[in-house]
């Protein structure tokens, strides 16, 4: 059998792809620069191609290098899962669990989720990571997260997906916005006044999928960095927005006397989902957390 690349060599290449700097990549890998350079050169020899182009100013991956990095990330994540499998067989439902959640879900479930995980998985140390969908899916693929909670539709790229709940988006407007107050469907709304989260939030994409606002989606006045900011903009009668059902009965809306919340026809929807790698050794934990999330969301819908 021909010699195969080692996981260490692949790890060196992945780290270099993240830093594009040999000294920094060596520091992160806890080796000398010459050791890291030698490992990558040996990897290039084994694969029979140039992976990295170097000059005095720049380090960049070749097209082959980019493809190898993408595959290396999967192999390294699978290797981590393999190591975890042994521990999981001997000590199930114990240890650290890193869970990613998007910002348009996290605030509404975290308190109950932490309580239920503490009750049902007392030997699990839960670490929560909040970030936008693309970032947490990328971290899941790279093995930095064990599972993530996000909203579909979203490109899950061959990962294992389990639906939690489906929910509609509701119209939220200022009570003095007569046009929106009297609307019965999306067709009745003045979409030039639709307020959205900034790019990167999947809730923005879900709203836009049903609201063809054209070039106005590039208008900075339509963007908010967070749901509380978006609600404040609507409360000031700068426009209306569409919010998920999970947010409707929270203090963010319930105690704001300026706002009206109503269900409308043809409203877009989203599906909350729990996602992990197909190679995960944490299937038991996945099943428990999925059940917890289903019960939590059932109380919020």
UniProtKB/Swiss-Prot annotation:
Domain HTH lysR-type: 5-62
Cross-referenced CDD domains: PBP2_OxyR
The entry's DNA-binding region: 22-41
Top-level taxon in the UniProt lineage: Bacteria
Transmembrane segments: none
GO molecular function: DNA binding; DNA-binding transcription factor activity
Keyword vocabulary terms for this entry: DNA-binding, Transcription, Transcription regulation
One CC-aspect GO term: protein-DNA complex
PANTHER family linked: TRANSCRIPTIONAL DUAL REGULATOR HCAR-RELATED, TRANSCRIPTIONAL REGULATOR OF OXIDATIVE STRESS OXYR
Family: Belongs to the LysR transcriptional regulatory family.
Function: Transcriptional regulator of the esterase operon.
The protein, known as: HTH-type transcriptional regulator EstR
Organism: Acinetobacter baylyi (strain ATCC 33305 / BD413 / ADP1)
């Amino acid at each position: 059998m021909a010699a195969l690349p080692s996981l260490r060599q692949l790890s060196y290449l992945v780290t270099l792809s993240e830093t594009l700097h040999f000294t920094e990549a060596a520091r992160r890998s806890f080796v000398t620069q010459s050791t890291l350079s030698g490992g990558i050169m040996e990897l290039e020899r084994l694969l029979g191609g140039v992976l990295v182009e170097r000059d005095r100013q720049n380090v960049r991956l070749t097209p082959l290098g980019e493809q190898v990095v993408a595959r290396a990330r999967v192999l390294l994540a699978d290797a981590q899962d393999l190591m975890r499998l042994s521990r999981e067989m001997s000590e199930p439902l114990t240890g650290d669990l890193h869970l990613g959640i998007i910002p348009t879900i996290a605030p509404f479930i975290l308190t109950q989720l932490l309580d239920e995980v503490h009750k049902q998985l007392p030997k699990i140390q839960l670490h929560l990571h909040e970030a936008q969908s693309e970032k947490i899916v990328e971290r899941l693929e790279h093995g930095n997260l064990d599972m993530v909670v996000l909203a579909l539709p979203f490109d899950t790229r061959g990962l294992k997906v389990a639906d939690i709940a489906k929910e509609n988006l509701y119209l939220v407007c200022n009570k003095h916005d007569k046009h929106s107050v009297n609307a019965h469907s999306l067709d009745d709304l003045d979409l030039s006044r639709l307020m959205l989260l900034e790019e990167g939030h999947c809730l923005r994409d879900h709203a836009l999928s049903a609201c063809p606002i054209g070039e106005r989606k590039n208008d900075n006045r339509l963007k908010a960095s967070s749901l509380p900011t978006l609600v404040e903009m609507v409360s000031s009668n700068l426009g209306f927005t569409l919010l998920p059902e999970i947010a409707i009965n929270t203090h963010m809306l319930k105690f704001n006397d300026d706002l009206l919340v109503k269900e409308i026809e043809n409203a877009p929807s989203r599906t909350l989902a729990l996602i992990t790698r197909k190679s995960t050794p944490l299937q038991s934990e996945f099943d428990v957390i999925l059940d917890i999330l289903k019960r939590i969301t059932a109380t919020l819908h």
